[in-house]
Design a protein with these regions (language model features):
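Conserved phosphate-binding/catalytic region of the ribokinase-like
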Residues: 4, 149-150, 201-316
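Glycine-rich phosphate/adenosyl-contacting loop at the front of the ribokinase-like
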Residues: 1-73
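Conserved N-terminal subdomain of the carbohydrate kinase-like
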Residues: 47-132, 312-316
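Glycine-rich phosphate/pyrophosphate-binding beta-alpha loops
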Residues: 86, 132-136, 291, 297-300
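Conserved beta-alpha-beta core of the PfkB/ribokinase-like small-molecule kinase fold
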Residues: 133-210, 227-228
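Proline-centered loop/turn at the N-terminus of a beta-strand
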Residues: 2, 157, 188, 218-219
Length: 316
């Protein structure tokens, strides 16, 4: 086992079109940042497993089936009959920017407890990945904190993605507090330039430097949308451009970037802080290309393109 992720598995509803009465027609896509991340890893050669919970409902069954079809180990995916599977509704404004609303009061992902986790999966893995959505409320917050402590105590790498979704937090300060906690646990961080501005009011370069100097992060990866990304460790910092594409749906692109980058890191078999400038560039190019190409298709998990397609685009 290479990577285990803990957190939310949900349905992303995206608007396809509006009918003649002005009502949206929506498509239901399997999603959730940790599983988008795992699906990219799996697509690009890693072995993965998921720790989480869905409801005993139609969408929960669909999500389990989707993970199984993606090759993700579902031994750690639990079903709860007392709560519904979490739903997210994604809408776009005239500029193509996304906004989110959620049916999660509570959702199945939020009621996961530490005593329910299959810790044998963590024992097998090289890396644990998590995000801030599993820190929004109890009991999943404590489950995440205890899982991170368990993984660190057993010598595993920890990867964290802030994945800021303000509608799920009581207020911005609560989000900031928990995200900063997550950053302090992490060896590897994938963060967007918008999230850097939210936390510190600065740009990608200063944000990456802060992650290394103030939080002990060993590899910082800052995504900048169509402008590409910045990767930095103790020895080097590189800027990588993203290929130009005409996006259809950017849902999950950041997660796919993160999973793609970690897949390359694991293949190299080197410590994150030991990666050379050339290695960071290669990781960034592959991840930025995979993420960009995914935006040409709807959904998250379903939008991940084959490795041959990524490599062909990089060569072209």
């Amino acid at each position: 086992m290479d990577v285990v992720a803990l957190g939310e598995l949900l349905i992303d509803f995206a608007c396809l079109n509006m009918d003649q009465d002005g009502y949206p027609t929506m498509a239901a896509h399997p999603g959730g940042a940790p599983c988008n991340f795992l699906a990219a890893l799996n697509k690009y050669g890693a072995k993965t497993a998921f720790l989480g919970k869905v409801g005993n409902d139609t969408f929960g069954a669909l999500l389990r089936r989707t993970l199984e079809q993606s090759g993700i180990d579902t031994r750690g995916l639990l079903t709860d009959s007392a709560v519904f599977t979490t739903l997210a509704f994604v809408t776009f404004d005239a500029q193509g920017d996304r906004s989110f609303s959620f049916a999660r009061k509570p959702g199945a992902d939020t009621v996961l407890r530490f005593d329910e986790l299959d810790l044998s999966l963590l024992d097998e893995a090289r890396l644990l990945h998590f995000g801030s959505l599993s820190l929004t409320q109890e009991p999943v917050r404590s489950a995440t904190q205890q899982a991170a402590a368990y993984a660190a105590a057993h010598g595993k790498l920890l990867s964290f993605d802030p994945n800021l979704r303000l509608p799920l937090w009581p207020d911005a300060e609560a989000a900031k507090t928990q995200i900063l906690w997550g950053l302090r646990q992490a060896d590897i961080v994938k963060i967007s330039d918008d999230e850097v501005r939210f936390l510190w009011g600065c740009g990608p370069e200063e944000g990456a430097a802060r992650l290394l100097a103030d939080f002990g992060v060993r590899l910082a990866m800052v995504t900048c949308g169509p402008k590409g990304c910045l990767l930095q460790n103790a020895g080097a910092a590189v800027r990588v451009a993203a290929p130009r594409v005409l996006p259809v749906d950017t849902t999950g692109a950041g997660d796919i970037f993160g999973g793609s980058a970690v897949s390359r890191l694991l293949q190299l078999g080197r410590a994150p802080e030991a990666l050379t400038e050339d290695e960071l560039t290669a990781i960034g190019r592959f991840a930025a290309t995979a993420a960009s190409l995914s935006t040409q298709y709807p959904g998250g998990i379903s939008a991940i393109v084959p490795e041959e397609t990524v490599l062909r685009c990089m060569e072209g």
